[in-house]
Amino acid sequence: VREKSWPLKNIKLIGIEEYDNPYDAVKNAKGIYVGGGNSFLLTHGLHENKLIKILNDVIISGIPYMGVSAGTNVACPTMMTTNDMPIIMPKKLDTLNLVNFQINPHYHEGPMWLKNEEGFVKHNGETRSQRINEYHQNNIIPVIGLFEGSLIKWQNQKGKLMIGDA
């Protein structure tokens, strides 16, 4: 899957699972890419393997970081604005804190419509906007809803929406 979907052919992508020591893999990386998956499982693994601090250290030193989906969630102060199911509970919800706001990846406004046989039916659950409002009932950190396929470049405490909508 990695070889088929990785768009940057001139950059070799090596999974952390291919290393005997994940800490050393991060410490010696020339770039950090964290893909999608379940944010609870990812956050759990980062804490269990004691990778939060070393990731912060290498990224703050100037090593580039790119996060997609769950990788975007863990770039935030916490993973509290994920859309994922809690399949495992991490010790903490704190994540990398690379930006001073939360991101809700895969954001879309309004209700969802689901294909049902030949037609579509409205999903009557909460919208992402409603969930973000619920988050703000107990938290003051701003949240950016990042639409599918969008890209934010964050550098030197400044962000720019490069592709898509937020």
Language-model segment annotations:
Residues 81, 85-166:
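C-terminal and late-domain segments of enzyme folds
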Residues 39-49, 114-117:
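Glycine/threonine-rich flexible loop motifs
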Residues 1-31, 35:
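N-terminal beta1-alpha1 cap of cysteine-dependent amidohydrolase-like domains
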Residues 42-43, 76, 83:
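Glycine/Thr-rich phosphate-binding loops of Rossmann-like dinucleotide-binding domains
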